[in-house]
Amino acid sequence: MRVLVLVILTLFLSCNNSTKKLPILSYKIDASGAKNYYKINYEGFTNQLGEPFKMKAKNIYISNFFFTRCPSICPPMRTELISIAEEFLEDKNVMFISHTIDPKHDSIPILKAYSEATGIPDSKWQFIKASEEKTKLQAETYMTNFKPNEDGSDFYHSSFVALVDQEQYIRGFYNVLIKEEVARLKRDIQTLL
């Protein structure tokens, strides 16, 4: 009986511990089949204050791609991200990054106005931009992409956000338009804290 209790307890604890570990998803597989892990890099990005964006040690980041004129998925994504940011407002180690995919239109003043409309402090949520080429390369590091529609008035892009850990590795992807995915994101944020 004692052995059975120990076996059950061991199984429970090992299952419980394994669910707390999040995989590192930022890697590429080389020709030999080996995983090459990489960190997210923000060299060349500027925030809504016109300052170079730099990731801070000890912070985790919820990161997405958007554009300020987006008429489709960006407004509901923004609403959900505002709600999540409000929930973690007091935690200085949880930050938000939104990359514009329309750097020609989304100037620093436009990003600043967009940021102010969220009601979330600049110190919590950074809206960033870079050259079109740099933004496309950044999207690739996040394993996503975007492209303009036929007349160039809109972009096709994802409703997923990424969770980036304190070491600048991607630890998860979440569709913030799905309630269960938002709940999973919140749990995973807590796991990394």
Regions found by a protein language model. Name each.
Residues 1-7:
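Sec-dependent signal peptide recognition
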